[in-house]
Amino acid sequence: VIIAKSIAAFLNSDGGNLLIGVKENKEKGKFEIVGIEEDVKKSRDHTLDGYKRTLIDEIIRTFFPPKIYNHLHNYIEIEFVDIEEKIVCWIKVKRSDSRVFLKINDRDIFMIRVDSENRTIEGEKLVDNCIKKWGSRS
């Protein structure tokens, strides 16, 4: 769900980059490359392609509306990069041309990105955000 919320927040904001396999070490004030190798071993066929397919099916298809899933290449690009001899999943997210709600436990959730945080907004703040970003209540 955390990955889905981050992707939704980027879609509803100005886009952005999500790195899976990078961990923030708050005590040291830096990021640590941990890689996704263990997650890849748990994926369908234990390959990067299987990991990518798992991300798409279990996150994008599950939590996002068909307009995102059916036109994934318009909004999301998934690549794998080798950093410090570990594999990192790099998800590049473009800003959506209309609002995107996540469906979690039969509730519609609207996320935005503020600085380095994902935030849920609702009510009047949601309406104001939609008008600001897309010019209407689209």
Regions found by a protein language model. Give the residues of each.
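Conserved N-terminal catalytic/coupling substructures associated with nucleotide/phosphate chemistry
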Residues: 1-138
